[in-house]
Amino acid sequence: MQADFGEYWMHRGDTRRVKVYFFASVMSHSRHKFTYFSKTPFTSELAIYAHQLAFRFYGGKPREVIYDQDRVFVRDENLGDVVLTKAFQAFVSSEHFQCVFCRKSDPQSKGKVENVVKYIKYNFLRGREFTNMEMLNESSVRWLARTANGLPHGTTKRIPAEAFKDEQPFLAPYVGTPAHPRDGMKEYLVRRDNTINFHSHFYNVPTGTYNGSGTFVWACAKEGHVEIYSNETGKQLVRHPLARIPGEAVLDETIRRTKLPS
C-alpha cells in the first residue's frame, strides 16, 4: 500500500472558500483506493485514525506501507535510519506492518498514490461545493465505489474493486476499532514578526509565513511541545518545547534564518 496527504480549497455556497485536508491510500496491485477528509491538518494521531479507517475499508492490513518522510510520521533521521514519532511508532508496533520511507530525492517510488492525490483533487473535489465535513466524507465513499474503484484503471485496464478480490486475501486481519483523536487543533493568527500567541506565550514560525493580515496557522499542544502546521499545505512547520514562564517567547533561531520555499 502507498499513502500520502493532500489539500484543496473548496467553495462554499456563500462564496467563501474552505481548505480541506485529506489522506489517500492505494493498494499497489489492484489500485483499490481510499480517502479520508479532515478540516484540520494531519497530526500523527489523526493520520493513525485515517490508517485505521483505511484498514477497516480494505478489510485487512497490508504487510508494507510506502510513505514520504513526512513529519507526521518521522521525528528525526539518524545515519539514514528514520526515527518515527512516538505515537506512530506505537501504532506500527501494535499493528505489525512495515514502513518504507522514500528517499527525499526519489518521490517517484510512491508515484501510484501521488496520482491518486491528483485524481481526488481534479475528479472528486474540483467543482464540488462544500457543505460540511461529514457530507464530504460520505460523498467520497460513494465516489470511491462509483468512480475511483468502479471504473477500469488507465494503466491496468482492470476495475480496481474487481482486482482487489484477488489481493484482499493476502492482507493481515484488522480487528481494531477506529477512534478519532482529540488533539485540540485550532487556528492562530500569525503576527508581522512571524510569531503566534499560543496560550499567552509567543512561538515563532519560519520567516515568510506571515503573508499579510489574516495569515493563520494551525497549532496544538502535544507531549510537552507545541506543533504548528501550515494552513496552506497542512505540513508541520515547526515543533517547539512548551514555554514555562508566563509571557515567554520561544524562538527557534534556525527557522528565523530560513525562509519558506516560494
Walk through the language-model features, giving the residues of each.
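Acidic/histidine-rich, metal-coordinating catalytic segments
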Residues: G60-G80
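Two-metal-ion acidic nuclease core segments, chiefly of the RNase H-like superfamily
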Residues: D81-C99
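Mobile-element integrase/transposase regions
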Residues: M1-F34, T43-L46, S93, M185-F198
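Protein C-terminal end segments and domain termini
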Residues: E223-S262
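RNase H-like two-metal-ion nuclease catalytic core shared by retroviral integrases
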Residues: Y67, N78-L79, C99-K121, L136
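Active-site-proximal acidic segments at structured loop/helix or strand boundaries
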Residues: V117-C220
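Active-site beta-loop-alpha junctions of metal-dependent nucleic acid enzymes
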Residues: Y36-K61, A243-G247
